[in-house]
């Protein structure tokens, strides 16, 4: 038996609903990947507590973001369509610089997803979704990118790509 359309759904195009579902999936994948990073830095042979804490917080933030979009989906009368989450491409990170670089690229993907969703909302005449993204996501995501870009610059300038001591100091002094 087919589901009846929601009575709540008004001015909510299926492409907006689809863009939100795509973003939810990306957030859940990012949360999973950040959890993998946190677990790596918690290993006894790596033991970088602040990197672990940083990536664990990122994992929780992505999970919270996915939940926020699921709530929005329900509020608008849409349907969250959850898919299987692919496992992270790697379980071992060759240090903080590589993990931070990967995290930065993940945040760039999240930013692009938000921008794509905003564009779809504008094209489909959905001021509610545009406002939601502008108030809750877009500026915050730019701040995240700025912070992580600064971390990468600091790690690079300290020579963390070649020297473990620089990475250790970054963990102790910058991420604490």
Curated annotation (Swiss-Prot):
Tell me which tissues or organs this protein is expressed in.
Expressed in the testes and spermatogonia.
Keywords of this entry: Iron, Iron storage, Metal-binding
Going by the entry's taxonomy, the superkingdom of the source organism is recorded as Eukaryota
* GO terms (BP aspect): intracellular iron ion homeostasis; iron ion transport
Q: Does the keyword Aminoacyl-tRNA synthetase apply?
A: no
Q: Which residues form the Ferritin-like diiron domain?
A: 10-159
Q: Could you confirm whether the keyword Iron appears in this record?
A: yes
Q: Where does Fe cation bind?
A: 27, 107, 141
**Molecular functions (GO terms):** ferric iron binding
Q: Which Pfam families match?
A: Ferritin
Family the UniProt entry places it in? Belongs to the ferritin family.
Protein's name according to its UniProt entry:
Ferritin heavy polypeptide-like 17E
Organism listed in the record: Mus musculus (Mouse)
């Amino acid at each position: 038996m087919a589901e009846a359309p929601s009575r709540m759904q008004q001015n909510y195009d299926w492409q907006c609903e689809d863009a939100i579902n795509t973003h939810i999936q990306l957030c859940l994948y990012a949360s999973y990947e950040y959890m993998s990073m946190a677990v790596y830095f918690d290993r006894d042979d790596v033991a970088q507590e602040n990197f672990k804490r940083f990536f664990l917080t990122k994992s929780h933030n992505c999970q919270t973001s996915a939940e926020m979009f699921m709530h929005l989906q329900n509020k608008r009368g849409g349907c969250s369509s959850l898919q299987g989450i692919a496992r992270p491409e790697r379980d071992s990170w060759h240090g903080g610089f590589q993990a931070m670089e990967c995290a930065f690229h993940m945040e760039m993907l999240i930013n692009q997803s938000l921008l794509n969703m905003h564009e779809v909302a504008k094209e489909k005449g959905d001021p509610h979704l545009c406002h939601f993204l502008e108030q809750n996501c877009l500026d915050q995501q730019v701040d995240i990118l700025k912070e992580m870009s600064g971390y990468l610059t600091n790690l690079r300038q300290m020579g963390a790509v070649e020297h473990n001591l620089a990475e250790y100091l970054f963990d102790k002094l910058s991420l604490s």
